[in-house]
C-alpha cells in the first residue's frame, strides 16, 4: 500500500515501548529503529545515535492509566534502589500529594468479543473481533476457540491473537437455509495462553442474541485461484474454509467476487486477520475494489521472508474508516484458511 509505515495503537493512542512516555515529534524529525542492549554492553560505533533509557516516565507506556505513571523495573544487580515521584514541571508544595504502589508483576490477560447480538442475512457473513487486554508484560500468543455453534451456521475458529498483538477478527456465517430459531445458548468461547510456563484458560463472552435478517443486497466471496480463475464454489457449499498456501518471500493469487442481489454499485473491500507479515500486494489507498456492475477481481497476497509456518483463517470485509482490521459489525466473506509454509525444495546451506 501507499502508506510507508504502520503504527500499532492502544485504544486509539500511541503505545510507547520500554516504559517511555508518548511525545510529539516535529515534521521531518528522524525516526530510528532501535535494539535494546543491557547495561555494560560494548557498542560498536556505527554513526547512529545511542539512547540511554532511564527508568522514568510521565504516563504509562501502554496508555491504560491516563495521566498516571507506571514503571516495570528489574534490578540489574544486587543493591539498594530508590523510587522518586515528582511533578514533571519541577513544581512542588504541601498540596502536591502522590500515592505510590510497589508490587511484583502479575502477567495475565483477558479477552472481549465485540460485534455481539448480530443480525445475519441468509447466505452471508458478519464480522466480529476479539480484543486482548494484556497485563504486566504478558506478550505471548492467545488462542481463542469457539464451540457449540448451531447447525446451519459457521464461526471462524480457532483464532489467534499473535504475540505482541491485541486483536484478531473472525467471520460469523449463516447458510442460505439457516433456521431463525437456532439455539445459541450452548455457544462457548474460551481463550488459552501460556503465562509464566503455565497454561491459563479464560472464559470469553459469546455472541449473545443472533438474529436472522432479510436477504442481503450482495454476498462477498473470497476464494483461491484455480487455473487463472476463481474456484466458483456454490454458496450452499460454504461449509468448510477453502485453503490457500503461500511461501514466505513469495506472492500468491486469490480472487474476490460478489453475488449481486439487486446492488450493482462499487464495493470497497479489505482483507482482515492476515498473519503479521502477510499483506495484500500492489494496491493503493482505496484497498481492493469490485467495480460497479462487475462481479470479480483478482489480487495477490505477499508474505515477508521472515513469516513463520502457520495456519490462519482470514476473510474479506466491507471497508470502513477504522485504522485497524476490526471486523465487528461489517459484512464479510466466508473465511479461507491461509497456510504459510516454507519452501521445502530449497536446500539448506
Predicted regions located by residue number:
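Short proline/glycine- and polar residue-rich coil/turn motifs
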Residues: 120-122, 159-168, 287-295
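C-terminal edge strands of extracellular/lumenal beta-sandwich accessory domains
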Residues: 1-137, 143-145, 177-179, 188-204, ...
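Short, solvent-exposed loop/linker segments at beta-strand-coil boundaries, enriched for Pro/Gly
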Residues: 147-157, 273-286
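Short, surface-exposed loop/turn segments at beta-strand-coil junctions that are enriched for proline
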Residues: 74-78, 88-90, 162-164, 173-181, ...
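Short strand-edge motifs at loop-to-beta-strand transitions and within beta-strands
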Residues: 69-71, 126-128, 166-170, 252, ...
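Short acidic, flexible loop segments centered on an aromatic residue
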Residues: 135-150, 263-276
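Short beta-strand segments of immunoglobulin-like
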Residues: 114-120, 240-246, 286-288
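Short edge beta-strand/loop segments characteristic of extracellular beta-sandwich folds
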Residues: 127-133, 253-259, 302
